Amino acid sequence: GSYEPTDRRVVAVEPSREMIGQRPAGAAPAVQAPATALPFAAGAFAAALAVLTVHHWPDRAGGLAELRRVTRDRVVILTWAPDAAGFWLTEDYFPELVAIDRAIFPTREEMERTLGPVELRPLPIPHDCVDGFLGAYWRRPHAYLDAVVRGAISTFGKMADVEPGLERLRRDLDDGTWMRRHGGLLERAELDLGYRLVVAPTPLPLAA
């Protein structure tokens, strides 16, 4: 919803009727369907966009193939590169998070098996990002102490116990350790945390 352009015809796809019900008034029409069974004709759209969602699909190859099938021009996917380095949150406090994400996010090679050659474009995250994914609060460390913030980040839900990491972060913020280690980040307007735009500009020929 947050990334839907308003200057062209858009059709959104959501697997959940509940998610469709949460779309704001005036949003583009939405169709309830899984990624692996898009109810559209081949080449129905000029472009397809998937934002931080592919790693949730139980059949990623099937979903990517469907994106390719319904798209005439390009497929664009926002994802996270499993070979990217962690950042202070995962390096100092929650190393399990990056291990979990590396196991579930698709690699470039995996996507190219279905989409053909792709281009990876770095997407630096601005310091005031409001979208609430894992790296959004890299310059606002206190936010990660908020259970509501963590509740919107799916990887936290996969951890067995977040309390030890939270306690270390809380202590380091209180005694100034975080500021001594990472205070330089407060001067940065944006940071490359491994998020990538995957662009497949020329779909492979459709299967007969």
PLM-predicted stretches and their roles:
Residues 49:
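A conserved beta-strand element that flanks and buttresses the S-adenosyl-L-methionine
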